[in-house]
C-alpha cells in the first residue's frame, strides 16, 4: 500500500502545478477518506475560489489516465445537462476539475505520486451518519445521477476490472474457502454467513448473466454509492454526487 505521509510544505509546490486563481493562504487536511489524501487549499483573494487538492491512491487506481478521462466525460456531460435545463448555481452542483501543467487533469510528481485538484464547493457538507432520511436522499440523488448519464456519448473505461462482478467475487470466495488461510471456515458464525451467501449467490450473479444474454443493457454506475459521497447545502438539500 502507498505511504500516506505527505508534507504540507510539499503541497504548496504541488498546487503551483495547477492552473488555479488567487494566492494560496493555507493548506489543511480535509475529511477522513480511507483511499486518497485530501486537502483544502484556501486562497487569500475574496474573488478567487478555494480548492480541494487530492493525492490519488495509485495502488487502488492504477490507470490514472482512464480514471480522469472518465471523470472528465461524466462531469462535462452532467454540466451540459444542467445548463440545458437552465439550472442555477451549477458550479455547486457538479464538480469542476482544474488542469495541471501540460493540460491533463492530474499532476504526477517525480516520486510517482499523482495529484488532482478541483474547485471547493462553499457552504456544503457531507454526512457520515446513515439515517432513513439521508438514505432516501442518497437513493434519490444517485438515481438522478444515473439518469443524467443514460445518454453519455463517450464510452467509459473500467478503471478497476471486475470490481462489482459478482461471479468473479464468488469465484474468489470459493477459492479462499478452499484454502481456509485463517482456519475459520469451520466456525459457527462463519458457516452461517457462508450459508447465507450461498443461498443468495444465484440471485447475486443474475445481473452478469442477463448482461451476457443481452437482457440487461450496460449502464454507467457510480460504484461507491454512500451517503458521504454526496454534498448537501446548509438546508440539508443534496447539491451533487462526488
Predicted regions and their residues:
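Juxta-kinase regulatory segment immediately upstream of eukaryotic protein kinase catalytic domains
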Residues: 1-28, 74, 78
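ATP-dependent phospho-/nucleotidyl transfer catalytic cores
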Residues: 2-5, 28-32, 54-65, 121-141, ...
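ATP-binding glycine-rich phosphate-binding loop
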Residues: 20-45
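Conserved hydrophobic/aromatic beta-strand scaffold that supports enzyme active sites
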Residues: 38-40, 117, 220
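ATP-binding pocket architecture of kinase catalytic cores
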Residues: 46-70, 76-156
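Hydrophobic HxD+1 residue recognition
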Residues: 225
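Catalytic-loop signature of eukaryotic-like protein kinases
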Residues: 228-231
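Pre-DFG segment of protein kinase catalytic domains
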Residues: 240-242
Amino acid at each position: 500500500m502507498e505511504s500516506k505521509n505527505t508534507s504540507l510544505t510539499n503541497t504548496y509546490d504541488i498546487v503551483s502545478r495547477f492552473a488555479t486563481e488567487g494566492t494560496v493562504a493555507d493548506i489543511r487536511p480535509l475529511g477522513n477518506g480511507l483511499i486518497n489524501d485530501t486537502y483544502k487549499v484556501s486562497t487569500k483573494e475574496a474573488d478567487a475560489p478555494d480548492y480541494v487538492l487530492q493525492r490519488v491512491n495509485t495502488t487502488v487506481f492504477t490507470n490514472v489516465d482512464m480514471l480522469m478521462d472518465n471523470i472528465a466525460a461524466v462531469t462535462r456531460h452532467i454540466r451540459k445537462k444542467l445548463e440545458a435545463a437552465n439550472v442555477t448555481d451549477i458550479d455547486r452542483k457538479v464538480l469542476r476539475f482544474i488542469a495541471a501543467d501540460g493540460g491533463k487533469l492530474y499532476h504526477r510528481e517525480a516520486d510517482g505520486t499523482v495529484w488532482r485538484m478541483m474547485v471547493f464547493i462553499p457552504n456544503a457538507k457531507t454526512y457520515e451518519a446513515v439515517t432513513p432520511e439521508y438514505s432516501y436522499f442518497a437513493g434519490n440523488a444517485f438515481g438522478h445521477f444515473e439518469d443524467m448519464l443514460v445518454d453519455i456519448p463517450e464510452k467509459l473505461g473500467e478503471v478497476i476490472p471486475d470490481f462489482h462482478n459478482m461471479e468473479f467475487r464468488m469465484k474468489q470466495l470459493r477459492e479462499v474457502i478452499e484454502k481456509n488461510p485463517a482456519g475459520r471456515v469451520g466456525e459457527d458464525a462463519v458457516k452461517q454467513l457462508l450459508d447465507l451467501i450461498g443461498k443468495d449467490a444465484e440471485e447475486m450473479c443474475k445481473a452478469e448473466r442477463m448482461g451476457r444474454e443481452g437482457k440487461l443493457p450496460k449502464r454507467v454506475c457510480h460504484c461507491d454509492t454512500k451517503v458521504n459521497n454526496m454534498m448537501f447545502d446548509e438546508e440539508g438539500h443534496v447539491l451533487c454526487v462526488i
